[in-house]
Swiss-Prot record:
This is Photosystem I P700 chlorophyll a apoprotein A2. Coiled coil: none annotated. Phylloquinone binds at residue 671. It is found in: Plastid, Chloroplast thylakoid membrane. It catalyses: reduced [plastocyanin] + hnu + oxidized [2Fe-2S]-[ferredoxin] = oxidized [plastocyanin] + reduced [2Fe-2S]-[ferredoxin]. Its EC number is 1.97.1.12.
Amino acid sequence: MASRFPKFSQGLSQDPTTRRIWFGIATAHDFESHDDMTEERLYQKIFASHFGQLAIIFLWTSGNLFHVAWQGNFEAWGQDPLHVRPIAHAIWDPHFGQPAVEAFTRGGASGPVNIAYSGVYQWWYTIGLRTNQDLYNGALFLVILSSISLIAGWLHLQPKWKPKVSWFKNAESRLNHHLSGLFGVSSLAWTGHLVHVAIPESRGEHVRWDNFLTKLPHPEGLGPFFAGQWNIYAQNVDSSNHAFGTSQGAGTAILTFIGGFHPQTQSLWLTDIAHHHLAIAVVFIIAGHMYRTNFGIGHSIKEILETHTPPGGRLGRGHKGLYDTINNSLHFQLGLALASLGVITSLVAQHMYSLPPYAFLAQDFTTQAALYTHHQYIAGFIMTGAFAHGAIFFIRDYNPEQNKDNVLARMLEHKEAIISHLSWASLFLGFHTLGLYVHNDVMLAFGTPEKQILIEPIFAQWIQSAHGKALYGFDVLLSSTNNPAFNAGQSIWLPGWLDAINNNSNSLFLTIGPGDFLVHHAIALGLHTTTLILVKGALDARGSKLMPDKKEFGYSFPCDGPGRGGTCDISAWDAFYLAVFWMLNTIGWVTFYWHWKHITLWQGNAAQFNESSTYLMGWLRDYLWLNSSQLINGYNPFGMNSLSVWAWMFLFGHLVWATGFMFLISWRGYWQELIETLAWAHERTPLANLVRWKDKPVALSIVQARLVGLAHFSVGYIFTYAAFLIASTSGKFG
C-alpha cells in the first residue's frame, strides 16, 4: 500500500477516492507539508532543485542554438538582416498537403519552416556570432553546463555534500556571493566579451579562441588603464555612417557615453553597452564586499535593522525583529525575490522596444511586438506570485510575538486604511475613465464627435519635454536651448540622446495625446485593482473582520458562497485567484495599447490611433476587428496562406479559453452526479466493464475546479492574443 502515489503523504496515499491523485499533484511541490520533513531537508531539497532548474534552462537555450544552426539561415540573415526572414526551425510534417508546403517555404529555405520572432538572431549577431559553427559551439557548451548542473544537483543531495541549515541562513555570505560573484563578476565577464569579441566583430575584426590573445581590443592596449588616462578608451567613436559588421566608418573607442542609437542598426551603441556593464560590475563588486562575514569588518544586516528605528517614534519599534522573520521564512524571501523579478521583467519589456539593445531589432516589428507582450505577461504572473507567497508567509511563518510593534506588525494593524485607500483609488479611476470612454462613445454614435471630452496629458508631455522632446514647445530643461544641461549634453555626455528623442522613426518617448491619457488611466485602474485584491488577500490571510481566526484554515481553503456566514472575504487563495483575472485583464489593455500605437506608427498613420482610441467602439472596431481580418482569412475557399497556423491557433485559443468557464461557472453537486452516472453506465456496459479502477471518482473540490478554470482561461487568453499579435503584425510587415 505504501507504494501508491503520493509517496510523500501517507494520509493522502490511503485516500480511497480520485482526490488522492489531484491533491497529490497539487501538493507535490509543497515540501513543507510532506511527511517527515525537517527544516534541514526542506532547504536541501530546494537548493538541489535549483540546479535542476539551471539544467533545464541551459538545455533549452542550447536547443535554440542547435536548431537554428541545423535548420536556420543565420549566415544568410547576417548578410542582409533587413530583408532575409530569420528561420527558427523546420516543420517536419506540414498538414494540409501541397498548399501548406508552399505557404511555409520561405526565408530562402528549401522546405517548410517557422519564422523566428524571438529576437535570438539579432542577439547572437550583436554579441559577435557570425557562423553556424559559432552556434554549434555555443550549443555544445550549454549542454556541458547543463550536465554539470544536473551532477551538482545530485551531488548536493549526497550525505557528504549536503549543506547545513546554518549555511543557508548565513545572509551576509550569501549577499556577498550573489552581489560580487554572480552580478558583479558576470557583468565584468560580459564587458570582457563585448570589448574583446562583440565590438571588434561589429567593426569587421574576427576574434576567436585562436587569436583573442594576440588581437588588442584597443590600439593603446592596457597602457591608458594603468596610466589613469581612461578617457582615451572613449575617444574616436564609430562614425554616424558606420556599417555594422564592417570596418567602414568604424572607430577604436571601447567604452563610451554617446547616447541615442547607431543610425544603421537603430540599436544602442555597443560601446555604450560595454561601458554600462563595466559600471554595473564595479558597483556590484564593491557592494559584495560590504557585509560582515569571517573577517569581523563590514555591515551586519541584523544590526542595521535593529538600529534603524525612525525618529519621533512614528513607526514604533521600526525594523526590530525583521531580520529573523525574513531569514527564517522561505516564503517571505520568495515573495521579495518574485516582487523584484516581476518589476525587472516588466522593465525589460519597456526598455527592449524603447532602447533596443540588439542590432536591427527595431526594424523587425513582429519580434518587437512579441518580446514586449511576452515579457509583460511573464511579469504579471511573477508579480501575482509574490503576493501569493506573501499571504502564505502570514499564515505559516509570521510570529506576532517576534514582530511586536515593528513596521510589519503596524502594516497589519492599519490594513483597513491601506485597503480602503486602494479601494477608493480603484473606484475613482474606474468610474472616471469608463465615464469618459462611454461619453465619447455615445457622442460618436450620435454623430457629434466634436462633443467628445478629450484631455491632453500635459503633465506627461512636460516630463517628456524635460527629457528633451521639443515637439510640445514647453522649452524646459533639455528641450530649452538656453539650459546649462542642454549645453553640457551636446558635448560632455550623451550627445546622441537629443537626436534620438526627437527622431520619429524610433519608439523613444512617443508623442502622446488624449487617447494615451485615457488608456493610461484604464491601465492605472487595472494595476490598482489587481494590487487591491492581492494586498487584501495577503493582509487578511490570518484573519479578517469577518473571521479573525482563520490561521488554522491554511492558505487554500475556498470562498464557498453564503454558507457559514459568508466566507468570500477571507480566503487568501481566492484573492490570488481573482487577482490573476485582473492581472490578465490589465496586461490585455497594456498590450492592446502598445500594439495598436505601434502598428499605426510603423504604417505611418498615427492619426488612426489618435482619432479612434478615445472611444470604446474605436478600440473594438479599428484595433481588434480590423486587425483580426487577416487572421480569420488564414483559410478561405482559395486555399491557405502562411498565416493559417495562426488562424488555427486563434480558434484553438478561443476554445481553450471558453472551456475555462465550464469549470469556473459550475456547481460541484452537478459534477458529482454526472460522474456517478457515467461510472454507473460504464460498469453496466459489456466490454467497457472489463476495465475497472480502484479509486472512487469524486468531483473536483471548489479550489481545484477554480484552478483548472483559471488555467484554461489564462492559457486560452494568451494563445488567442499571441496568434492575433503575430499574425496581424507579420501579415502587415512581412
